[in-house]
From Swiss-Prot:
One of its GO terms (molecular function) is rRNA binding. Belongs to the universal ribosomal protein uL16 family. The keyword Ribonucleoprotein applies. It comes from Oltmannsiellopsis viridis (Marine flagellate). GO terms for biological process: mitochondrial translation. Part of the 50S ribosomal subunit. Disulfide bonds: none annotated. The keyword Transport does not apply. Its main location: plastid. HAMAP family: Ribosomal_uL16. Keywords: Chloroplast, Plastid, Ribonucleoprotein, Ribosomal protein. Pfam families: Ribosomal_L16. InterPro entries: Ribosomal_uL16 (IPR047873), Ribosomal_uL16_bact-type (IPR000114), Ribosomal_uL16_CS (IPR020798), Ribosomal_uL16_dom (IPR016180), Ribosomal_uL16_sf (IPR036920). This is Large ribosomal subunit protein uL16c.
Length: 134
């Protein structure tokens, strides 16, 4: 699963997801893409699940690009813990996705295959998505 090798700080603020994606919203590498339509967090597990579906579906014919990277650590406290005693330990990593962000791009396959592969991948995503063709 994806995670950064090192970060400047161990813990980050959760932040707010405002506005549309200004970067990473164009089809850059492939011919077909999966684009988010709403803001949200994609965990490294969800990104990996989508990658597995796409690689199995397109076999060796297509090439896949993952356009997002989980670089934000999400901390959690143990259950039944009183308030105070600092912020919790990092539990998992997420990628912040805004509306318009391209999540996956593929090339080297026909449009019907790409469309059905992206549809299956979209079921694994926590945000609404759409299929984009060049």
């Amino acid at each position: 699963m994806l995670s950064p090798k090192r970060t400047k700080y161990r813990r980050y603020h959760r932040g707010r997801m405002k506005g549309k994606a200004m970067r990473g919203n164009k089809l850059t590498y492939g011919d077909f893409a999966l684009q988010s339509l709403e803001p949200g967090w994609l965990t490294s597990r969800q990104i990996e699940a989508g990658r597995r579906v796409l690689t199995r579906y397109v076999r060796r014919t297509g090439k896949l690009w993952i356009r997002i990277f989980p670089d934000k650590p999400i901390t959690m406290r143990p259950a039944d813990t009183r308030m105070g005693k600092g912020k919790g330990a990092p539990e998992f990593w997420v990628a912040v996705v805004k509306p318009g962000t391209m999540i996956y791009e593929i090339t080297g396959v026909t449009e019907p295959i790409a469309r059905s592969a992206m549809r299956i991948t979209a079921y694994k995503m926590p945000v609404k998505t759409q299929f984009v063709a060049r």
